[in-house]
Amino acid sequence: MDILLLMVGLLLGAGGVFVMLRNQSNQALVERDARIDLLQKQAQEQVRNAAKEVELAMKGERIQIREELESELRSRREEVDSHQVRLDKRESQLDRKIEQVDRRDQELDQRRGQLDKEQKKVEERQQHFERLIVDADKKLEEIAGLTRDEAKSRIQAELVDRARHEASRQLKQIEDDTRAQAQKKAQEVICSAIQRFAGEFVVDRTVSVVQLPTDEMKGRIIGREGRNIRALEAATGCDLIIDDTPEAVVISGFNPVRRQVARRALEELVGDGRIHPARIEEVVRKARKVVSQEIREAGEQAVYDVGISNMHPEIIKLLGTLKFRTSYTQNVLAHSVEVAHFAGIMAEEMGLDGKLARRCGLLHDIGKAVDHDNPGSHAVLGGELCKKYKEDDTVTNAVWSHHFDIEPNSVYGPLTNAADALSAARPGARRENVETYIRRLEELERIATEFKGVEKAYAIQAGRELRVMVAYDRVNDEGSMLLAREIAQQVESEMTYPGEIKVTVIREMRASEIAR
C-alpha cells in the first residue's frame, strides 16, 4: 500500500513538473517572438536611415561635380578668350610687319637704283684716277729716275722693315709678360720639388779598377804565356789593361754589366789566390749570377722607392742594369729615380697624376740600358721598349719625346724633360772632362759669331751662359730679342749638353767728342 502511494505521488510530481516546464517553454517562445519582431523593426528602421544617408550623399556629390564642371568650363572659357586675344594681337603685329616689309622693299628698290647710279659714278672716277696715277707714275719716273718696279720694291722693303720692327716690339712685350708669369709659376713648382726631395748622393762613378795586394799578382793574373788573362778576357768579354800603374789592373769594356762581372770575378780570384783557366770560368759564372741578382734587386728597389707597381719583369731588369751606367759621371739609375721624384712632385703641384708622372720619370732613360747594342738614340729605344712591354701610351710618348725626338701628345712629355733637366743641372750632379768642356765652350762661341751683326761672343759660367756682343748700328733693340731667340734655337739644334744654356745679347752704343 505504501509502495502504491509512493508511485502515485511520483506520478503526480512528474506530471506537475511537466506542466510547469511546458508553461515556461511557452513563455520563452512568446518572448523570443517578441524580440524577433523588435529586431526586425530596428533593422528596417536602420535600412531606411541608411538609404536616406546614401541618397543625401549622392545628392551632395552631384552638386559638387556640377560645381567643379562649371568651374572648369569657366577657366577653359577664360583660356580660350585669352588665347583669342593673343591671336588677335599677333595677327595685328604680323599685319604691321608685313606693311614694314613692303615699305622696306620699296626703299631697297629705291636704294638699289641709287647705288647703281653711284656705282657708275665710282667706276667713272676710278677710271679717271687710274689715268691720273699712270700720269703721276710717269712724272715720278721722270723726276726720280726710278722705274715703277724699283719704287715698288723700295716701298715694300720699307714696309717689311716697319712691320718687322712693330712685330718685334709686340713680341718683346708679349714675351716679357708671358715670361714673368711663367717664371713665377715655374719657380714655385721647381722650388717646391727641390725642397721636398733630397737625394742621397751627387755623383757615383762606376768602378773599373781592381786594386791588387802586390805587383807580383799581375804576373799570376797574366799566367804562363798569357793563358790566364786570355781566359779571363774571353769569359768576361772585357779587356784587362796591366801597365805600370802600381798594384792596380784596369778593366776596359763598353758593356757596363760585363765590366762589373769582370771586376767581381777578378776581385774574388785575387782574394782566393787560385788563378787558372778552369777556376776563372767557374768564378766568372758565379760572378755573373751574383751580378744578375744584384741587377734584379736594384731594379726592384728603384721601383719600390718611387712607389709604383705592375712593372714588367724585363723592364725591372733593364732598370737594374742602369745601376752600372753613368752619364757625365752621374749614375743613371739614381738619376732616373731622382727624375721620377721631381716629376711626381711637380705633377702634384700642377694638379696632375703624380704616380703617372713618376712612372714616366723612372723610365725616361730606360733606353740607355740597351743603346750600346742597338742603333738609335736612347729616347727612341726607350719608347720602343715601353711599347713592347705594354706600357701606357702616355708613358711611352713621354719617354719617346723627353728629348723631343717626336712631338709630345700630353703634358707629361715636357714635364719629364723639365725633371730630367732639373736633375742634371743640380750643382755637382754631373761633370765632364776638360777636353769636352773646352770643345763645348768653343762650339757655343762659334755658333753665336756666325750670326749677322755679332762682334764677339763669350761662353761663361762653365758654359751655362752665352753672352753675345752686337754692333749697335746693325742690330736694334727689337732685333736683339730675335737674335737671342735664333741663337738659342741654333744651339738647341746643333749641340747636346746637360741642363740649359742662357743666351744674353748685349747692345751698347758709345758716343764721344773732344772739347777743345
Curated annotation (Swiss-Prot):
GO terms for cellular component: plasma membrane. It holds the Pfam family KH_1. Endoribonuclease that initiates mRNA decay. The lineage of its organism: Bacteria, Pseudomonadati, Pseudomonadota, Alphaproteobacteria, Magnetococcales. GO terms for biological process: mRNA catabolic process. It is found in: Cell membrane. This is Ribonuclease Y. Belongs to the RNase Y family. The chain crosses the membrane at residues 1-21. GO terms for molecular function: RNA binding; RNA endonuclease activity. It is a single-pass membrane protein. PROSITE patterns: HD, KH_TYPE_1. Coiled coil: none annotated. HAMAP family: RNase_Y. It is an enzyme of class 3 (hydrolase).
